[in-house]
Amino acid sequence: MKYEFSTAISSFCAITGLSSAMAQVKAAGYDSFDFPFSVYSVGFQAPMVQQDWRSFLRSVKELCRQLELPVSQGHAPWLQDIPSDFHYVSPDELYHRCIEAAAYLGCKHLIFHPVRLRERIDSLSLKERIHDWNVRWFHELIRTAENYDVYINLENTFDSHFVQKAGDPSYPYTTGEDMLRLLRDIGSDRIRLCLDTGHANNSHRDIPAMIYSMKGELATLHLNDNFGLKEGSFSDIHLFPGKGQISWAPIMKALQDISYKGIYNIEPIDSLPKVDDGERIRLLAHGREKLKEMLSLQQV
């Protein structure tokens, strides 16, 4: 069986420059890449917030053509939080812009984090308010997604700010059930799911069970490894698969059992921002081969 592999470049593209980052991904043997709208949308000088943002996209599309490296998925920015008083704020125009941009680059799947409340969620009623806020917020993006034939992919999260305490409800959108409920309550065929394995591990989830629960809705992957959530330290370290504590064989089996048809995308940070170009290519190539090996073992 032939698999397609892609990688994120968000951890190093600002250091190397976009054209060099894409060239390194191509040199490492990947079929496509995950375009980081999140990187190019932050800051007053970011190209996606400029009036001539479409000229930036034309240059990206030309690079894709020259390198024969398509954009298979993209990552939207996460610029909005739920206000403490829960007053509603519509999606920033930039989110609509990113959907249009994804379509222009030939990218069908744009990944979004659910909008979070950066406070402790100590009751089910508070968690329900967060859910209702997200349903309303994402529903406002549906028409744009329909107009540009793009799918909004909802990514599972984790308690990155260590706000939860023992006895509290699970942090919102860390379970397969939460993700499926958000998808269904938004109520559009423009919504799909993205599984981030590192986030799931940081939330102490059974990752294969999440995959089985998402059958038919799972469209994209953020495959990465870590050593689990450690309070007081940054734990979302995005190692290459196989370099942390996650057990990968059951994950690959689950993906094959549900007949996952999407691209196998890794989202590494690891040491990629710190090494030279040659070493970065080597690490990316090794990560791809390791992933390919994990998949081939399921064919035996």
What residue ranges belong to the model's regions?
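N-terminal small/glycine-rich loop or linker at the start of catalytic domains
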Residues: 1-8, 72-81, 117-121
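Histidine-acidic metal/acid-base catalytic patches
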Residues: 1-6, 11-31, 92, 106, ...
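Short, conserved active-site loops that position catalytic residues or coordinate cofactors/metal ions
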Residues: 34-43, 72-78, 114-116
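Glycine-rich, proline-tolerant flexible connector loops at the mouths of alpha/beta enzymes
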Residues: 35-59
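Short acidic, glycine/proline-rich loop/turn micro-motifs
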Residues: 44-46, 84-85, 121-124, 163-167, ...
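Active-site acidic/histidine proton-transfer and metal-coordination neighborhood
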Residues: 58, 62-66, 81-192, 202
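Short, well-ordered beta-to-alpha junction loops that form the rim of enzyme active sites
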Residues: 76, 113-115, 155-158, 197, ...
